C-alpha cells in the first residue's frame, strides 16, 4: 500500500494543482518577510498524544519563546492547518496544496511515520523542509538520501534498541520477550521492529528473543492470555505502549496475573521524555523532579480503585526513555497550563469541535516535541538569515544550520549530520518513596551505534533492586521457567565421580604418604622435644585461688590490691599493668601478654636459647604459651615487684650500701646479656628490673624484641632511651650495646635520687620536651640531676653514672668496665645485703603505725564516697541490703506506673551536632529532668541514649499516687522542653514522645559483678509500646492508666481519647492523650496538639511481604519511617528487660 501511494503522488499532484484548500492565514506585520507554515495535523487519530487540540498551542508558544530569546525577530508567520489524520491520501492532497498552490516555506507534520514519509518525499521535489514530530522515530526516516529535508527532534528507535541491548549486556540478560500495544499508527510495532533488528546485529550482545507479541488493549481476554504466556518463556520483558492508559493497564495486569514477583523485570522503552509519568492532569499528584503525573494515577476524576494495584506493578518496571531533565521547569509548567487555550487564540484560531468543546485536561504527550522542532527551525532560520538577510529558503544554506544543540522542553536537543537527534537515554526506576530516579545514562557518540553507560549509583543492590529484595533477577530462573529444572544436589550430581576419583587418588598417594610419614616422624619428634622445652600449654596456666570469697552473690566487695601477702606493690603500679601472677605446676609464676604473631624457625630457636640463659641477675625464662589468642611469657616470680615500684612506692629509707647493691645487680645482669647471643637488653628500664624476696635485682623482658615491636612504646618509656635510638627510631635488632649503658645510667640516677626518671614533678619540661632535647643533643646535652640526700654516697659512683650517659656511644664505658669499677667501690665494712635489709626493716616498723592510721582515714573517706555512689545507682533499701551481704529477693508490686520517653528525631538532631555538643545537649537536658524527677518522688530506672525510663510506686509503695506523680512529672517535662533552647541550634526545638502505663510489676536485682535493679512484666512492655506509638509533644496513656487517673484524681486533668490503635503484641487498644491540668489548657495549644477525634488504625505488615515496603495509615501514601528509635535491637532492649 505504501508503494502504491508513492506511485500515485504525481497523479495527485496534477489533480489538485489548481485547488486551493480553505485555510487560516494570519500575519503579524507587512514590512518583514512573511513565512508560510503548512501544518498537517490530526484531531481524531491518537488524540491524547498528537491531537491538534492538545498539541497545536506549542507552535505559537515556540515562536513566542524564540522571539524572547532573540530569534526570528525579522520574520512574520502565516499558518495553514489541514487535518490529514495520518491518512496517506489526505497527506498527498494536503502536501500538493501546501507545496504547489500555497507555496509554503516549511511544513510541520504529519505526526505519523507512514504519512510523513509521503510528505517528506513531496517536500524533496520542492526542496522545502519538513519538521517531524509525534510518531516519527523509525530508523529509515534518518536516511538523508531518501529524505534530505526531513528534520526531527526524536532519535531513531534503532538507537533505542542499541541502548536496550547495552542494558541487557550490563545485567547479563540474554533472553527477553517483546510485547507492544496495537494502535492505528502502529508506532510501537515499528519501534519493536527496529529493536529486533538491533538485537539481530552480530556486533551487539547476543540476545535471544523468546517471544514477540502484540497486545490489543480493547480485548481484555487476549491481553491476559498474551501477558500470561510470558510466565513459561521469559523473566525479562521489553514492552512498548503509546498511551498512559495502556501503561497503567499493563502495570495492573502484571500485578493481577502474578508477574510482579522478584523474578520479573519489565523494561518499558519510550522516547517521550516522561519516564514513569504522563502529562500533568488537573488535581493529580506529580513527581517532585519532573512535574509529571505518576502513570499509576487514574486518568479521570473518578478513581477506579486500582491505583495501588498499578503502583505495585510499577515497582517491577524500569524505563528506558530520553533524558527528561528540563532546565526551565517554570516555563514547562506555564506551557502545560496554557497550551489548551493558546490553540484557540490567534494566530491559530482553532474553531473545530475538538478545540472548542475539548474535554482534555492536560497537554498532549508529544506537544513538547512539537515545541522543540519549531524552536529548532527558528534557530536555523535565524542563523541563515543573519548571514544573508535576503536568503532564508535556500536549502543548501538552511539545512546545515539545523546541526546544533539547545535545551528544549524534552531535555537537551542535539541534532547530528543526519538531521536526527543524538539520543541521551536514561534508565529510570522508583525509589523507596515511589519517586522517579535516574539510575544510569546511555549516550551515543555521533556516528556510533555502541551506547556508553554512565552509572548514577555505587551500590546496585540498594539503588536498583530494592523492590526485588536486593538481588538482580536472572534471565532464566535457577529452576527454569516451569520450576521443574532445579539443579540436583551436589552429591547427587558428582557423588559417584568424587568417590571414584578419591579412591584412585588415595591408592596413588598411599604409598608415598607412608614413606613420607616415616621420614617426618623422627623430625617431628625431635622438634616436639625441642619445643616442649619452652612451649607451655595455656591450660597449664591457672588463676590464683582467692583466699576468701564473699558468701553472698549480691554483696559488694573490692578485689585484693596485692600480688602476695608479702608484696607491697599497689594495683596501680606499672608492674601490675604489665604482669600477672598465675600458677604453673604448683608454683606461682610471672606472666606477661603479647600480641599474637607468626613465629618462624629462627624465632623458635631463639626461645630455645633463651630458655638456657641462667644468671643470678636475670629473671629466669621458663617458657612461652602460644596456643591462645595472645602470647604469654612465663618467668619466675619476683614477689617484691619492680625496682620502679620499690623506689617510688616504698616508704623506707635507703642508704648508700643498699643503693650500691642494687646498681651492681643491674650492671651484672646487663654485662651477662652483652656477652650472650642476645648482645643487649634493648628495653632496660627501672620497670623491667624486678626484685625477689632476697632483695636481689633480676632483669626481665629481654629477648622479646620481636614481640615488643608490635607494641607502640609510650612516651614515658622513651625517657630511658639513648639519644641515637630516639633519633633513628631504632628497633632492638638495630641497637648497639652502648644504648643499654645509657639506660643503665638513667636507672642509677633514679636509685641515687629515689625520684622518677628525670624528676618530672620538679621540672618544668614534659615528656615531649625532654625527649626532644635528648634527641637534639649538642655540646651540653640535657641529663637528669643527681642530687641525693644520702650522706655517704661515693662521688666516684656519680662520676661513673655521668660517664655512662655520654652523648657519643663510643665515649660510654662497656658493661664489663662498669662492673669492674663497681667492684672497686665495694664498701669494706659491709657483709651482705640481706643483713643490711633486716636492719633497715627494724627501722621501718617504727613508721608503720603512722601509715596505718593514715590509711584508715582514707578508707573511711572512700567508704562514704562509695555509699553515695551506690545510693545513686540503686534504691536505698536495696543498696543497704547489698552492703550487708544479703540477698535481694524479687518483689511483686500490685500497682505501679511506668513512664517511657524519647527525644523525637534525635538522630537528625544529633547529625547537626558534634559528638561533644550531643553530650552537652543531653547532659543539660537530663540534669534538669533529674531535678524534676526528684521533685515528684519518682524513681529513675535508667536513661539509654535519648530514652528515659521512670517508675513510681516501687520500691516504696504509695497507694495510687504513682499515676498522679508520673503525669505531673510528664507535664513538667513537656513544659521544660517548650522553653529549652539548644545553644548551638537556636532554631531547633526538642520534643518528647511519652508513653505511660499502670499495672502490676516485678522488680529485683540481677547480676553479680555489676548488679542492676530491673523491672519485669507486661506493664513495662505496654508502656514502651505507648511511647513508640505516641506522637511528638504528647503524653500517651493506656486505658488502665487513664482509668486510674480519672478514678482517683477526678476533674484534675484534661484528657482526650485517641481511639483504638493496633499495638504490636497487644492487638487493638483504646488509648488516651493527657492534655494538661484542668484550667491550664490554652485553646491554641489544645487545638494544635490534640489529634483528630476520628479513630486511627495503624497496620504493620510482615517484612517478607511485598506490602511491607512501607507502613502507612489509611489514605496516606507509603513512606519510610526514619525514626532512629525504631531500631529493632533498641526496641527489644527497652521492651524485654530494662535495667539500670
UniProtKB/Swiss-Prot annotation:
A GO MF term: ATP binding
Residues on Cytoplasmic side: 517-1140
Tissue and organ expression note: Expressed asymmetrically in ASE right (ASER) sensory neuron and bilaterally in ASI sensory neurons. Expressed in PVT interneuron.
Membrane topology according to the record: Single-pass type I membrane protein
Listed Gene3D superfamilies: 3.40.50.2300, Nucleotide cyclase, Transferase(Phosphotransferase) domain 1
Annotated ATP binding sites: 544-552, 582
TM regions (residue ranges): 496-516
Residue intervals of the Guanylate cyclase domain: 897-1027
Location of the region described as Disordered in the Swiss-Prot/TrEMBL record: 1083-1140
UniProt cross-references to InterPro entries, sorted A to Z: A/G_cyclase, A/G_cyclase_CS, ANF_lig-bd_rcpt, Cyclic_nucleotide_synthase, Kinase-like_dom_sf, Nucleotide_cyclase, Peripla_BP_I, Prot_kinase_dom
Principal place of residence: membrane
Biased composition (Low complexity): 1109-1126
UniProt comment concerning the protein's domains: The protein kinase domain is predicted to be catalytically inactive.
Protein name per the record: Receptor-type guanylate cyclase gcy-3
Native organism: Caenorhabditis elegans
Encoding gene, per UniProt annotation: gcy-3
